[in-house]
Amino acid sequence: DSKSETVSPVPLPKSGPSQAHTEQALDMLRNAERPLAIAGGLIKGPECMAALTAFAETFDVPIASPQRRFHVFNSQHSHAAGRLPNRAPAPLLDLMKTTDLMLIIGDRGGPSMSQSFTFPRAPKPDHPLIHVWPDAQEIGRLWHPTLGIACDPEEFLKTMLAAGGGGKDRSGWVKELNDAHKNVMTWTPVSSNDGVVFGHVIQEIGKHLTENAVVTTDAGNFSSWPSQFLHLTQKNDFLGATVGAMGPGVPCAVAGGLSTPGRQVVAFCGDGGVMMTGNELATAVQYGVPLKLFIANNSAYGTIRMHQAKNFPGRVTATELRNPDFAAWGESFGAKGFLIQNESEVAETVAAAFKHDGAAVVETRISLNHISPSTTIEAIESS
């Protein structure tokens, strides 16, 4: 205990867009036929998220979400345009690239969101670009936007809404993108002879996920499965590193559970990442966080293995892993351990894990060949 005085966080000042910037943004938006907004991590809190939804509906603008920010817009909303993780699905990305106006709202922009600085292209985008970010020093650092607005994203959205909607009929464009997005998020079951394809597990988890669950993911190719197939709402939180740093999955889940008690907490980790910081499971058990930890175990550093297949086919070096029994490992911390070794065990095991009151660890022996939803190791090596 401490006798130090407890103080609340200092409220940060929020600035809105200038009248000139508002008028220019309105003019650009109302004249666009195929606008696309990318909403980033500064879209947070109920009011800001509600403003984003109202903006999408009022101006008839489809909304995409970047890597690890998939909760900022309801993935089942009619104006959902899809997700921009690392290596976004080509059919969806190609359609997005036909936009005639991009808006980046509440995201500074980086290699993941921009698909390695190709969307928007750096330094000069292929499309007119409006970039909304509070720090003026960030605007123009990577891209030369048509209009850069240094202001709070929530204030931008509310100012635009106060000015009213209007513009061209974009219902066809919105539906075209939304249909492509829904197609990408539709899982077509496949099987493999080297383990469970992780999509089967994701589909079952989706049936048990609450609308306000905290979802975290570690770094690795396994994360492409929940990133592509797990539906999220604005009441969820989706946490994880936006680039390739391994290890945040379990600590993020513990922090999410401790800071928002009473919410469902679901974490995804690969076997490599969970061996780095998974010991924080002890903290979850100690403080009663009912964490459900799903470990995708392919006995490899899967992402590095994918790059080896692409750049040095047939030359596997230092990516194979000798792993513990993760179900027993989880039980050693006081969690309930589960193991999935084939597809027939998925539904029952996932249901049992969610039914368990406390922390649970679910190890799935997944296919290494099915390295992501879009390709296999065999296909990469033969290409």
Annotated model-derived regions:
Residues 69-176, 350:
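Glycine-rich, acidic loop regions that bind phosphate or pyrophosphate groups
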